[in-house]
Amino acid sequence: MSLIPSIFGGRRTNVFDPFSLDVFDPFEGFLTPSGLANAPAMDVAAFTNAKVDWRETPEAHVFKADLPGLRKEEVKVEVEDGNILQISGERSNENEEKNDKWHRVERSSGKFTRRFRLPENAKMEEIKASMENGVLSVTVPKVPEKKPEVKSIDISG
């Protein structure tokens, strides 16, 4: 993640992408000592930054987020400040029994938030979201491009 602040007021994962506005995580990629890896209550940064693909088609902007193990009730899709698409949610820790002995904790838990500045051609009032098999799909239709009106002129003579 970039340590360079965005000119748009947030932090970006890619300094060349003005639309990516991820929440800054100073511990992203930080390796924990092996002794801490067995602590079941520890939040893991891998889920904090859920992976999202953003594809633009002629008709829409399509976002796909991998959110394995989450139900749609645990995920929020919101538009704030008129053009910021925010995807957020939380995965809870698994219940721990007193007699349980954890050998390895690799599945992540905790909160995540991803934010994207949508371009001016996005139709905010027509955004649709669906979730299937742990993949969130958000479709943001685009305003159709105005094609220049061409008027044919008769040539006399």
Swiss-Prot record:
UniProt keyword annotation of Cytoplasm present: yes
Which part of the chain is the sHSP domain?
Answer: 43-157
What do the Gene Ontology cellular component annotations say? cytoplasm
Classification via Pfam families: HSP20
Question: Which top-level group of life is the source organism from?
Answer: Eukaryota
Keywords of this protein's UniProt record, alphabetized?
Cytoplasm, Stress response
Q: Where in the cell is it found?
A: Cytoplasm
| Record-stated family | Belongs to the small heat shock protein (HSP20) family.
What is said about its interaction partners and assembly?
Answer: May form oligomeric structures.
Indicate what this protein is called per its UniProt record: 17.6 kDa class I heat shock protein 3
Q: Which organism is it from?
A: Arabidopsis thaliana (Mouse-ear cress)
